[in-house]
């Protein structure tokens, strides 16, 4: 609210960072309810781990986003995880899928296309979070949403 005083409850907030991935229904300034959360790795944590796997520098979010600029987001078919809880998310399987792509390429003595894999990963994360946020907005009737946390700074949004 500090930087956007025009944002008035009720609204939904996607908090996506290295430590949290939550969809929060904000009913009033002191009354909120967590609708969904990550069941394993937070989105930012997944970005950091994927960056390390791809040989990109820390922090992973900006590094993956920068590499993804020239990549093809459709080059790799990464999984869409299915989890219990309508608004919950999971990123550990996605992170493992990236590691598996890198390992497959190494076993075949092939080069991995870092921009393509970064773009595919970034697109999948953004798609998962956007889908859950829009589903929550439709179900709650929320007219406003906000994004918070380091992952929210990703240019893909």
What are these regions (language model features)?
Residues 5, 20, 27-70, 95-96, ...:
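Glycine-rich phosphate-binding loop plus the immediately following alpha-helix
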Residues 11-14, 143-145:
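A short, small-residue-rich loop immediately preceding and capping a beta-strand
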Residues 17, 145-154:
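Glycine-rich beta-strand-to-loop/alpha-helix junction loops that act as flexible
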Residues 65-145, 155-157:
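A contiguous, well-structured pocket-lining segment that forms one wall/lid of small-molecule binding clefts
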Residues 1-11:
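Conserved phosphate-binding catalytic cores of ATP/NTP-utilizing and phosphoryl-transfer enzymes
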Residues 13-15, 21-25:
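Short beta-strand scaffold segments in enzyme catalytic cores
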Residues 10, 19-20, 72, 85:
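A generic structural signal for well-ordered coil/turn residues at beta-strand boundaries
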């Amino acid at each position: 609210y500090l930087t956007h005083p025009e944002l008035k409850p009720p609204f939904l907030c996607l908090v996506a960072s290295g430590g949290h991935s939550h969809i929060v229904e904000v009913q009033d300034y002191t009354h909120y309810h967590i609708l969904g959360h990550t069941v394993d790795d937070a989105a930012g944590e997944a970005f950091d781990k994927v960056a390390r796997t791809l040989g990109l520098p820390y922090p992973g979010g900006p590094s993956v986003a920068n590499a993804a600029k020239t990549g093809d987001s459709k080059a790799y078919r990464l999984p869409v995880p299915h989890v219990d809880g309508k608004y919950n998310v999971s990123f550990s399987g996605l992170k493992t899928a990236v590691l598996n792509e890198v390992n497959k390429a190494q076993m075949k003595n092939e080069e991995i296309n870092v921009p393509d894999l970064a773009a595919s990963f970034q697109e999948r994360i953004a798609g998962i979070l956007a889908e859950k946020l829009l589903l929550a907005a439709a179900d709650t009737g929320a007219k406003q949403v906000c994004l918070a946390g380091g992952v929210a700074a990703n240019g893909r949004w």
